[in-house]
Amino acid sequence: MRDLMRRRLKEKRQLPVLLCGLFLPFGQLAAREADVDRFSASLKIAAVNGVKLHYFQNGSGVPVILIHGGLGDYREWSAQIEPFSQHYRVLDYSRRYNYPNDNSERPDHSAIVEAQDLGALLDALKLERVHLVGYSYGALTALFFATQHPERLRSLTLAEPAIMKWLLEIPGGQAELDKFMTTMWKPAGDAFRKEQPETALRITCDYFSGKGSYDKLPTEGRRLLMSDVREWKALTTSQDPFPMLDRDVVRRLKMPTLLITGEKTLNPLRMIIEELSRVMPAAERVTIPGATHDMWLEEPEACGKATLSFLGRH
């Protein structure tokens, strides 16, 4: 199994373009495709909060909840299921608009809605106190849930949460936010409103990985992105996709917290993680050498080991 994972990672690095982005877990496209059959037979469905969520459980003991990033789904955690489930009961689920869920779209989607879904899912599965591990937009979801239900968390692991509105109060952050919104976010939303999802993905990839990067993707890569495109549409057309998190509320969180960042991450995410470290001075912090925002996909072993080490102490 480990040799297979290593081969998949090698194939991933040989893709024409390694797409790293703010919420985009594209890096391990080939491996994610190969894992469909491996996990699909074990998927279950929970009807919660007016939607149906596909989820996968493995292992036993204290629950660890894995929350994927944007334009991704439960499959992006495939490399973590085996090592994590040796010690914990792992719950890996797809958020409401991500593959293979087929929920009707509702206006003004946000991480607040995702946090409500998470709470309802935990209630349905009778999980009281859990470890939360969130990546990118999934980390933003985890952080909102933590501020609303701190008593339910044993620990909180945040891999570069997209707290975009904090950039407004960080030196140099306004310029980064403006670039993000005007170059990619708003044009992608406009493309979705014109029913042009592939154009929206092309705009997104151009921003994060350079012009023409989408067109260099193999066919299976485009298909995988398209399988999760409904979430991207819901977010880029929302009136408030990045709700403001009150710094004082975050500062009062007392559960053990781990912050994970990539050494070569994007400027806005570096600014946000630095600010989060300042707001949560007791939080532990790990930097993954050589990694971008796609750290969990580029360096799954390093990310997994860092997280398991942290969980083992809490």
Please provide the spans of the model-predicted regions.
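Conserved hydrolase catalytic core segment
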Residues: 128-167
